[in-house]
Amino acid sequence: MLLLSAVTTVGCAGQRGAAPSTERTTPVDADTAQRTMIDVVDQATAALGGEWETRTSPDYVESCQLSSNGEGARWVYRVARSESGDAEADAVAASGIWRSDGMRVDRLVDAKGPAMVARGGDRVDTIRFFAFPGNDSIQALSLCIAGDADEIEEQQADG
């Protein structure tokens, strides 16, 4: 069971207590949202090192709700590695990367090991890092884009 801890790290010291904005000033298209999500995951895995395997393809799309309450779609990407590094050092490294991207990073309380979740910024909706013995994983959700997840999935299958 994961519980949200009282430990929150804010990306900008000058904005103590303020959460980074999740609103984009310009809309993003499906390809950009997907590519950016992949880049954010790749940046984290490169910094953490090791052999990461895809568990959920970055082509996986699901429904989400736009800030206008309309229907949207987002990409999901999950990678994992079976050999673990230094769990605490990896959690600190991942958090530092995401804070530098303007994201708010929260540490979740989990008996298995460090669990970090980052939100905000303008690159992904959410990215999570779980440093559990023998099973480190990173999961990212792209920004929510205008569109229908089922239609996007059908287009991928056709194309």
Tell where the protein language model's regions lie, with residue ranges.
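Short, charged, intrinsically disordered terminal tails
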Residues: 151-159
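Bacterial signal peptide processing site
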Residues: 13-16
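C-terminal motif of bacterial Sec signal peptides marking the signal peptidase cleavage site
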Residues: 7-11
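Sec-dependent N-terminal signal peptides
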Residues: 1-4
